[in-house]
Curated annotation (Swiss-Prot):
Pathway: Amino-acid biosynthesis; L-proline biosynthesis; L-glutamate 5-semialdehyde from L-glutamate: step 1/2. SMART domains: PUA. Pfam families: AA_kinase (PF00696), PUA (PF01472). It comes from Paramagnetospirillum magneticum (strain ATCC 700264 / AMB-1). One of its GO terms (biological process) is L-proline biosynthetic process. Disulfide bonds: none annotated. Substrate binds at residues 54, 140, 152. Keywords: Amino-acid biosynthesis, ATP-binding, Cytoplasm, Kinase, Nucleotide-binding, Proline biosynthesis, Transferase. The keyword Cell cycle does not apply. Belongs to the glutamate 5-kinase family. ATP binds at residues 13, 172-173, 214-220. This is Glutamate 5-kinase. It is found in: Cytoplasm.
Length: 370
């Protein structure tokens, strides 16, 4: 089975040079409809799909009569104009397959600020659970030069990391990684698989080569590094053919970046090895047994909360004797955790005034010792 077909959760990134006709500034609806059919086929076999789509600035600037190079405020105005047209194009294409589309606008801060990261992840998880296809773009309308991601390759990789995706496909104007830029060097050799981003691999990166696309091979290798560390497989391939996802499955040329671990394993390694605990939760015997059986940690099983931590921080989990059982990412702040400890999940809203997660630490965010 191909890495694409094996993915339970798939991210698809489309550059603006693929989605927007260079000569007219219009969305390439015929091509988009074939991609929508591919996405529908993925969903029909049980896969979850998230799209990261460029093109808002490219579409919007034509409508506003803006001529490149654009100032930051002109790009933002173009994005505001183009985003609504882009959303309609995606909605129309997927509606033919009875698929609900959700527009999500993100900035780099949403993926690096813990609170915003958790909110964005929760929203995306909920949309996927409800059967929708989230269509994500960088929020160019409010992003500044200092906080812009700068390319949707990197944004797509951050999203893949955020939702523990199994695979990310970067559609480009080139069919994969070569030892040199094949458009300039006839002796450039194609690289079908990469297992590690060595200095030699990084030296193979080329320059951007399309009128609209701002993501060259350099940004794609940055995305690959993020994906490999997150246990997510990533492909670089040409997006121009009709039915581009099906083309990959049918053996179309692409470069696969293959990690050594799965997303869930990589995420737990990150929690265990990279995050410093900022607090401690002490459990009763029943909660300790539940965790040993692979279940989530509920507020009812907490007997003591110590430390100062915020939602999304890492905390130690101990039993009543003080033995460390594990560590995990907590869904409530220290103050809120103290307020709901020992209480049933159904009481959370009445106590805190809002309804968050039922679990204090979800099992996917928990790493047990040993």
């Amino acid at each position: 089975m191909s890495p694409l077909a094996a993915a339970k959760r798939l991210i698809v990134k489309i550059g603006s040079s693929l989605l927007v006709d260079d000569s007219t500034g219009q969305v390439r609806r015929g091509w988009l409809e074939t991609l929508a059919a591919d996405i529908a086929a993925c969903k029909a076999r049980g896969q979850e799909v998230i799209v990261v789509s460029s093109g808002a600035v490219a579409v919007g600037r034509r409508k506003l009569g803006l001529v490149p190079p654009l100032k930051l405020e002109e790009k933002q105005a173009a994005a505001a104009t183009g985003q609504i047209r882009l959303a309609h194009a995606w909605q129309d294409a997927l509606a033919h397959h009875q698929i609900t589309v959700a527009q999500v606008l993100l900035t780099l801060d949403d993926s690096e600020n813990r609170r915003r990261y958790l909110n964005a992840r929760s929203t995306l998880e909920t949309l996927l659970k409800l059967g929708a296809v989230p269509v994500i773009n960088e929020n160019d309308t409010v992003a500044t030069a200092e906080i812009r991601v700068g390319d949707n390759d990197r944004l797509a990789a951050r999203v893949a990391q955020m939702v523990s995706a199994d695979a990310l496909v970067l559609f480009s104007d080139i069919d994969g990684l070569y030892t040199a830029d094949p458009r300039k060097d006839p002796d450039a050799r194609f690289i079908p698989e990469v297992h590690e981003l060595t200095p030699e691999i990084e030296a193979m990166a080329g320059d951007p080569g399309s009128a609209y696309g701002s993501g060259g091979m350099v940004t794609k290798l940055v995305a690959a590094r993020i994906c490999l560390s997150a246990g997510c497989r990533m492909a670089i391939t040409r997006g121009e053919p009709m039915h581009p996802l099906k083309t990959i499955e049918d053996g179309g040329r692409c470069t696969w970046f293959l990690p050594n671990s799965e997303p869930r394993t990589a995420r737990k390694q990150w929690i265990f090895g990279s995050m410093k605990p900022t607090g401690t939760l002490v459990l009763d015997a029943g909660a300790a047994r539940a965790l040993a059986q692979g279940r989530s940690l509920l507020p009812a099983g907490i007997t003591e909360v110590s430390g100062a931590f915020e939602r999304g921080d890492c905390v130690l989990v101990k039993d009543g004797s003080g033995k460390v059982l594990g560590r995990g990412l907590v869904a409530y702040s220290a103050d809120d955790s103290r307020a709901i400890m020992g209480r049933k999940s159904g009481e959370i809203e009445a106590i805190l005034g809002f309804r968050g997660r039922d679990e204090l630490i979800h099992r996917d965010d928990l790493v047990m010792e040993g």
